[in-house]
Each structure stands twice: as structure tokens, then as C-alpha cells.
Amino acid sequence: MRSLIIFIAILICGGTYCYAQVDFYDQLADSAASLVNPNIIYDPSYSILDYPNGDVVADRGVCTDVVIRAYRMFDIDLQRLVHEDMKMNFDDYPQFWGLNHPDKNIDHRRVPNLMKFFERQGQAKAHSLSPTAYSPGDIVCWDLGGGIMHIGIIVKKKSVDYQRHLIIHNIGGGQVIEDILFEYKIIGHYAYGP
């Protein structure tokens, strides 16, 4: 009897955790969608940022800033988290920029670094061509070609044909929601939550 009670308690607690996780990702998707602003100027220039919780000027940004700003709504500071992980594990991160130490002003704004962070600290998911493999709140990364990578967050809104969720991102036209899930080669698919 005692074993049955323990088993039921584990099921209840485990279910609560799973529900809380799903609820977080739904809230993340909604928060990300609230960032829509087509007037954001695409500006990849290097900026000296406050630390922690530093951000570029509010009317500017790139694709990574959409993700960073969405998580900040939950007091999750990717600038600090990425910087701390890179300080402890610098050699595990991409070495494309010729640096020999982390840079708290830019590291979290680079797609390859976010991919590595989400792989290390979150949940890497399969790169699938099935729309059902992607859920609101998931993070997706693409290879645009020519060495350019891109990142966005899946929102709840669906495509016109209701086949797939849309993405909030910034590829140069501001922070917008578009049907781009399968427009480019997917190179990363993650879930990251508290």
C-alpha cells in the first residue's frame, strides 16, 4: 500500500512539473509575440552593454535580441547566463571570432553561442520536417547560407493553412511574426526554461 501511495505521489508531482513546463512555454510564446514591432531597426553593430541585464537601444536589434527580450520578461537574463557558462567552458563554445575570452557585450547576441548554450543548458530537440514537432515557445535556428545563421521563437499563431506555427524573429524587417519555419535549413531546435 505504501508503495502505491509513493507511486501516485510521484505521478502527481511529475505531472505538475510537466504542466508547469508546458505553461511556461505557452507564456514564453505569448511574451515573444508581444514583442512585435516592425519599426525595430536591424542593427548588428557592437555595443557596450550594462551587465547584467544589458540590452541594445530599444528601437534596435537583431534576431538574437528577440529571444533575449522574450526571456527577460521572465527575469531570465541570457546575457548573464551565457557569459557565466562561457567563462567556465569557453573552449566548448564556437571560436569563430578570434577571441580568447568571453565578451559580455556580444556573446549572447551571436546565434552560434546561443545554440551552444541551449544545447548545454536546455533541451536539444530533433530537426524535423514535420510541423507537429515544433511547439509554441520552442527556439529554432536556421542556416541562411553564406555563413549567416538566424534564430526565432515559435508562437501560438498558425499559418494560413493551419499546418504550422509561425515564428517571431528579426531578419531585417523589424520584430515580426512570419511563416518561415521551413523557409531555410533548420540547424537547431531547442526548449529552454526554468
Label each PLM-derived region with a short phrase.
Residues 63-66, 70, 136:
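Active-site-proximal alpha-helical segments within enzyme catalytic domains
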Residues 33, 37, 68-76, 83, ...:
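Sec-exported extracytoplasmic/periplasmic mature domains
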Residues 24-29, 87-168:
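...with weaker cross-activation on analogous glycine-rich loops/strands in unrelated enzymes
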Residues 164-194:
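Low-complexity, Gly/Ser/Thr/Pro-rich intrinsically disordered linker/tail segments
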